[in-house]
Amino acid sequence: MKHSYIKVFLTLCLLLFGFTTQAQIVSSDEDEVIITDNQGNEEDIDFPEAMNEDVDSLLSLYHAKAYLSIDENCQMRDINPVFSQEVYIERLRSLPTVMEMPYNEVVQTFIDRYTGRLRRSVSFMLGASNFFIPIFEEALEAYQLPLELKYLPIIESALKPNAVSRAGAAGLWQFMITTGKDYGLEINSLVDERRDPLKASYAAAHYLSDLYKIFNDWNLVIAAYNCGPATINKAIHRANGEKDYWKIYPYLPRETRGYVPAFIAANYAMTYYCEHNICPMQCELPVKTDTVMVNRDIHLSQISEILDIDLEMLRSLNPSYRRDVVPGNTKPSPIRMLPTDITRFIDQQNTIYEHRASELLTKRSTVAVTIDNSYSRKSSKGRRSRTYNRKSKSLASKSVTIRKGDTLGAIAKRNGTTVANLRRLNGISGNDIRAGKRIRVK
């Protein structure tokens, strides 16, 4: 969800009019567009990561290879027609949306990007939308949100379920780990539900609903989806309480300023593609699938090899299992397959569970400790010897020579002991001692 880079702010006056005719595009290249106003202020905006996605990587996805094809009856020409500003304004105004879709030069730049350089990507996304848009609409409807939000994943991920951004956001809706967990998605070393289209869509709808309760403005909601509500509140504060996206624009993070224009352009391109000679890829919807619950760990390769199912298809149907391991031991976990394959799985599940299990699911629960007995004896002997030596030194006897004129009391005092102890150590019953003799003091 990281998207734009800004060098110099456009003036607030320009923003108040939504860039309508005062901004001018100076240049546009593969990664950024430079905009200048009539005061000479310049602004560089990076395109979202998804707008730089290589179309070949999109076409290499399993569902693209299996179910999408070029429409031979539609001639997609490379010529992108040029229309007047009035045409774009009217088309955006005519969109059946709750959210406002204003026109300005920034929006125009993103429209040109989608309908120009990204024509093949739009063709792919129009075909792939047959898989995902019904899921998005179902989740958005459940939270009573505007259905035009279904195009948010266009700018987030280019409808690539396994997309991962440079910042670590993942899935169609590009959740960061913390936000994903906050909205109930399981994320660990084996499972990443950010990649599950259904679960991630409901989590995204929930998050968008919460953001609208905070801001009550859909443009601010979209911006907050990109940079977080706290950052939007800071921008509002710096803009003296203004709650219009285009008025707080100068105070937004660099990566957020192209976000709303990109969203507007995505709605335009996914609606008016015909007017720009873009042909959607034909989509042959796959047969319906179902899930089977497993309560033991299982690897997708075990299923693939025993049931002769394309492993790539299993991965496509179960994108949340990031290492192909379904952790059924932790809790009952679903595996999505064709209904006929589920029947075969149930019939052969014992064989499937046992197939290459020691190779694919090696995870020891107990381990034996290997002991070298010869080393152990030597080590133990050394420890005992060291202990004995320490004890011997601490308990070693000590004797001193009795001086002329010495008494037991004087000897005891010099050596930190008592007369009674001297008598006990030396077997003395009285005080009779002789100078020059040895007496034990310890």
Where are these regions (language model features)?
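Alpha-helical scaffolds flanking conserved acidic
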Residues: 146-154, 170, 218-223
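An acidic, Gly/Ser/Thr/Pro-rich helix-cap/linker signature
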Residues: 5-7, 22-143
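Extracytoplasmic and endomembrane cell-envelope/extracellular-matrix remodeling and assembly machinery
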Residues: 74-124, 131, 142-143, 187-190, ...
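Short, surface-exposed glycine/acidic/tryptophan-bearing loops
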Residues: 106, 163-184
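Bacterial N-terminal signal peptides
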Residues: 8-18
